Amino acid sequence: MASTTNNTPIDTVILDIEGTVCPITFVKDTLFPYFIEKLPSILQKFQYPLPTTTTSDNDDDDDDDPVLNILKQLPENIIQSWESIFNHFKNLVDQDIKDPILKSLQGLIWKQGYENNELKAPIYQDSIKFIESFPTVKSKDNQRKIYIYSSGSIKAQILLFGHVKNSSTSTTSSSIDNDTIDLNDKLNGYFDITTVGFKNQSNSYIKILQEINKSQYPQSVLFLSDNINEVNAAINAGMKSYIVIRPGNSPINDEDKKFHKIIYSLDELDL
């Protein structure tokens, strides 16, 4: 395993979302249940069995419905009824399986929730402060950047950071209403499992380094996550990586605490 102790200055930070900048309970206790609650009424508006990609090639109307286009990616035996589709997705959610089709559909349904003001992202205040301030501090080449890497789709990431619940009066981000701000203009890019791969695989972080032109300077990149497997994967790709401990996160064993830097708030970062 590569060492995370290196004097190379950090000018790029990659943030995980749940359990790192956002309470892990928001995804499991708010976003997932919201998706399951809204799913039946969305599925029931279609006629079953759904057309497959092959049978609907000449139906231009099908292409106008983003939900239907996602559902048509499912195996034919699943799209015979709305109940079978619902059970399929509910099973994936219950088992916390990172399925790309599920993530795409969740992103669409969450979009409606954010736009209807039914959903707001409870980003930690220390994380809001860091995201707003880190890029504004000048480095030698003035290229300090923040990226997001999450198993949730990029669309879902943009929605989440675009509808952040804020209790501070000193924010520098654009306001949507009195208690909602948009942090997306502070972020330089987003990655998910469809663009670079799964978060517990080192090759995913190697791809990110290539995408952000940091392959030659991996130690100038810091990845923050609550997941030890993700932290190890990032370190093995050459990055620096710290474990973030937040209320409700899975416990970190003493052995891992010995060999990894631990932080409890992004306020602890001195970059």
From Swiss-Prot:
This is Enolase-phosphatase E1. It catalyses: 5-methylsulfanyl-2,3-dioxopentyl phosphate + H2O = 1,2-dihydroxy-5-(methylsulfanyl)pent-1-en-3-one + phosphate. Bifunctional enzyme that catalyzes the enolization of 2,3-diketo-5-methylthiopentyl-1-phosphate (DK-MTP-1-P) into the intermediate 2-hydroxy-3-keto-5-methylthiopentenyl-1-phosphate (HK-MTPenyl-1-P), which is then dephosphorylated to form the acireductone 1,2-dihydroxy-3-keto-5-methylthiopentene (DHK-MTPene). Keywords: Amino-acid biosynthesis, Cytoplasm, Hydrolase, Magnesium, Metal-binding, Methionine biosynthesis, Nucleus. The lineage of its organism: Eukaryota, Fungi, Dikarya, Ascomycota, Saccharomycotina. InterPro entries: Enolase-ppase_E1 (IPR023943), ENOPH1_eukaryotes (IPR027511), HAD-like_sf (IPR036412), HAD_sf (IPR023214). Belongs to the HAD-like hydrolase superfamily. MasA/MtnC family. One of its GO terms (molecular function) is acireductone synthase activity. It comes from Candida dubliniensis (strain CD36 / ATCC MYA-646 / CBS 7987 / NCPF 3949 / NRRL Y-17841) (Yeast). Pathway: Amino-acid biosynthesis; L-methionine biosynthesis via salvage pathway; L-methionine from S-methyl-5-thio-alpha-D-ribose 1-phosphate: step 3/6; Amino-acid biosynthesis; L-methionine biosynthesis via salvage pathway; L-methionine from S-methyl-5-thio-alpha-D-ribose 1-phosphate: step 4/6. GO terms for biological process: L-methionine salvage from methylthioadenosine. Substrate binds at residues 150-151, 199. Binds 1 Mg(2+) ion per subunit.
